[in-house]
Amino acid sequence: MVRGKDDEETVTKKFLEWAGDLPMVAHNAKFDISFIEMAMKKYNLGTFKNTVIDTLELSRTLDQGFARHGLSALVKRYNVPWEEDAHHRADYDAEGTAKVFSKMLQKLTSQNYNTIADLTKLVSTAEIHKFGRTYHFNAIALNKTGLKNLFKIISLANTTYLYKTPRILRSKLNELREGLLIGSGCYESEIFIEARSKEGQELTNLINFYDYVEVQPPEVYNHLIQTSDFKNEEELRKHIEKIINATKEAGKLIVATGDVHHFEKEDKIYREIIVNQKVPGGGRHPLAKSNITNIPSQHFRTTKEMLNDFNFLDESLAYEIVVTNTNKVLDMVEDIEVIIDTGGIPFSPRVKSDDGTQYLDCPSVVTELVYTKAASWYGENLPYNIEERIAKELYGDIVYKCCYQNAKENNPDLEEDKIIELTFESLHNIILQGFDKVKELIGEHIEKTWNEEDGVLDEETKKKKIKKELGGIIGGGFDPIYLISQRLVKHSNDEGYLVGSRGSVGSSFVATMMGITEVNPLPAHYRCTKCSHSIFKDDDGKELGATYSSGFDLPDKMCPVCGERLYKDGQDMPFATFLGFNADKVPDIDLNFSDLNQASAHEYTKVLFGVDNVYRAGTIGTVAEKTAFGFVKGYFEDKGITNKRTCEIERLAKGCTGVKRTTGQHPGGIVVVPDYMEVSDFTPFQFPADDPNSAWRTTHFDYHAIDQDLLKLDILGHSDPTQLRMIQDMTGTDILAVPLDDKDTMSIFTSTKALGVTKEQIMNETGTLGIPEFGTPFTIGMVAETKPTTFAELIKISGL
């Protein structure tokens, strides 16, 4: 009230009469209009209906290329004379706003926006979320449905509606609200901000959107006093009381929360250091302002601390919001399994046919691929050791065991050699008849060996027992993984690139027969590429594998059947190396694709499973120890502190190490969501490093958190397949036809002679300088010392 001037009611009436029904223009109009609306309500002057144009929001849509849209920025942009010292005087700001708007009108007219209705066309419906006022809120999942909806909200906020920061439309939040409790949030919440200018029913209407309203201890809002948003703590406390009273009048739950950002009170220094840094991607933390000299302590307060922080309230009211109501929220929440316990075996995706019209019977396809290739390499009547190897890899030991027992029981008078013959004949036929026949065989075995003391053998018990007995690739449910890998390799091969297998997948003969790996894990042997004859023993009946660790080191030999030169094969790798001794370990098939073809292989997964079923494996980048050390030093330099000891800097750096800094993606990891489930059953998704231009979306969780739930394909890029392709193109030589026992090639590991140079010319004792993995100082020294002459020795050196 100004002495000798009209009162508020009179001034409001005069202003409304003067303005009439004309449109009103203001900068940050929502704030200004709220005071007019409050006065009109207070003096029963009706409802405010004038059209309002906000130069702040208009600038955000008209000048999208600019980061700043405050009035001080606009007057500079539109060349309006301006004295910054006079800023925030009502008449001066109004004049400046009018002049800016006049310039804006000229720009709008030049772009053919001539009416107020035309302004609605400035922004498309798809981009409207970029320009609205945003508020913070909290969401608590009450149950599994709520958790799934929470994941969907996080996904949408980080992709569809991502603009500078994650955001979600209120309408979309309402659509996905089932199973969630929506809380009002912190000092950046709608209720905390709008309660400054709204009261009564208007404030109640805002509160009614939320399931519970939050207030934090005054200390948590302390920075708002430093920024002059509040005059003092007394005004801040009254604001908190206003929110509490309005919430109770609205019949909603009012809850005291901590807006926790660090655990102990003394940990505040770590947050101060982090806040002091630039935000990845540009900008500063909201608390990193020059007028905020002391950020609030947002530690995890005890109940006693919380009650003490709200001691300005009535004691019973403080207890209600700190203890009673927080427990009411807790009682609403069910125990939820966030990460599904699968027992370590991921959900397997279904695999579609090449034309995409049907789902493949993976066990049958895998079996057919394996036996077709095995027959072409080793003949229609497979050697017993190969037959047994395939059976054990596909199903574990149980199928061979059942076939042997049946052969023995049905033919008690036959000699062992004949029993073995019948066993393998039965084994071959049963596996080719399919998975159901295998389960039937095991079921019969269980019925025969079941004892009364084991209890009643009903169908459910038998199913569980069959599942327990089964192992291996098909028995363990890993056949889709093999089939997917086979299709990825074939896709790359069809595009003209080799694929190298990494790690222990080479110990799987099934993988070899499916074309996933070129490594043959059988013991050293000969096989004829013309007539499929194979030899595993020498002339004395001794296993070749007992003498030779690698088949590539076998002496040359001609086929005794057709006279063709025999191919030397076999690296003697037990299957347990890959799938475990019980054949129950989840296979991890790592493949090296050409770095020129890796992107194509990644895109092919979208063809195999669909765009919404494949995601890059997400990673979380944290503050490294050395980076944290730099943060601490920079913090003290900004504060003008120069006398800190190194040990103190290291202590503080340790507290900052491991803090999340950004997100990223695994270089080759593709996570596959089976099409009978949704990604929101497991994780939200986002763009890596919040980059909306990324071709891929990533899992929001670090992939390690869900690696036992979802299959991860390791489609890695490597230079070796690229180099081999280039060599093949330059020489016209088929890489796969190059003999691996060439004596001149082997000699370069002990001499430079075969290369036609001297060791002085290349300054190296051997010719390995340009060989991948063998040209480093360490391996050069190892090769010079060990002088390998066989392929097996090279394998051992590579292993070191």
Where are these regions (language model features)?
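Short glycine-rich phosphate-binding loop at a beta-alpha junction
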Residues: 23-29, 255, 498-500
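Mg2+-dependent phosphoryl-transfer active-site scaffold
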Residues: 106-376, 405, 418, 488, ...
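Acidic, divalent-metal-coordinating active-site segment for phosphoryl/phosphodiester hydrolysis
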Residues: 89-102
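Short alpha-helix plus adjacent loop in nuclease-associated cores
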Residues: 41, 52-73, 137-140, 266-278, ...
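Conserved beta-strand -> loop -> alpha-helix junction used to position metal-binding or nucleic-acid-contacting
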Residues: 46-60, 118, 182
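Catalytic DNA-binding helix-loop module of base-excision-repair DNA glycosylases/AP lyases
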Residues: 491-493, 504-516
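Conserved non-catalytic scaffold segment of RNase H-like nuclease domains
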Residues: 1-49, 64-78, 84, 88
